[in-house]
């Protein structure tokens, strides 16, 4: 049970790994943390691993990914979050498969201008070994890379329940959360 008296059973969410992906400002962290709170499943993001284990160097980045991938492999339910693309995407997929428990992959898709506006308001600094490009450039680029990874990896894996969930730019967190909770509760 969580602080709101809800449990994974009450939410009708079977034990599974739930990977939330999306570009900067898409609401991944907000939705994933709320889902973790309401299910009792542990939450892990690559950014949290970077903060905890990284130091802004390549070694720190590798160390952060080692921890994130170990959690992907672990045969236990969890709520996971990263953008869903990049050089480690195939390792994430492979390690999720190694966990041998059901996996739902949910891509949060919002209008890019909404994501740019949200990401531009952030103050949080994440240790990362490469310089960040301006948000207005990064958001569409990341979206395009996720699109490629979605078509070539996430939606093609038959052992994953993969859902591309699109929202309007005015969708509230509650609307997004309700849709994600429904996806995770659905029988495969």
Positions of PLM-derived features:
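Pre-Walker A adenine-sensing motif
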Residues: 2-11
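Conserved glycine(s) of the Walker
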Residues: 27
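The conserved Walker
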Residues: 24
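Structural recognition of the conserved hydrophobic beta-strand(s) that form the central parallel beta-sheet
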Residues: 78-83
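Small-molecule kinase domains that catalyze NTP-dependent phosphoryl transfer to phosphate-bearing small molecules
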Residues: 125-183, 187-188
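Conserved phosphate-donor/acceptor-positioning beta-strand/loop module used by diverse small-molecule
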Residues: 99-122
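Hydrophobic anchor at the beta1->P-loop junction of P-loop NTPases
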Residues: 20
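Conserved substrate/cofactor phosphate-moiety recognition/catalytic segment
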Residues: 30-76
């Amino acid at each position: 049970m969580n602080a709101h008296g809800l449990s994974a059973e009450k939410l009708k969410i079977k034990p599974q790994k739930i990977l939330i992906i999306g570009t900067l400002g898409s609401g991944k962290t907000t939705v994933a943390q709320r889902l973790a709170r309401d299910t009792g499943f542990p939450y892990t993001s690559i950014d949290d691993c970077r903060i905890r284990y990284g130091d802004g160097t390549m070694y720190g980045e590798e160390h952060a990914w080692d921890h994130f991938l170990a959690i992907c492999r672990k045969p236990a339910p969890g709520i996971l979050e990263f953008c869903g693309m990049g050089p480690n995407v195939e390792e994430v997929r492979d390690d999720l498969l190694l966990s041998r428990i059901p996996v739902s992959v949910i891509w949060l898709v919002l209008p890019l201008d909404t994501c740019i506006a949200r990401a531009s308001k952030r103050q949080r600094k994440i240790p990362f070994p490469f310089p960040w490009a301006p948000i207005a450039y990064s958001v569409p680029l990341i979206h395009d890379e996720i699109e490629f990874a979605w078509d070539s990896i996430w939606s093609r894996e038959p052992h994953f329940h993969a859902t591309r969930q699109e929202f309007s730019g005015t969708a509230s967190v509650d609307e997004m959360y309700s849709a994600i909770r429904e996806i995770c509760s659905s029988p495969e």
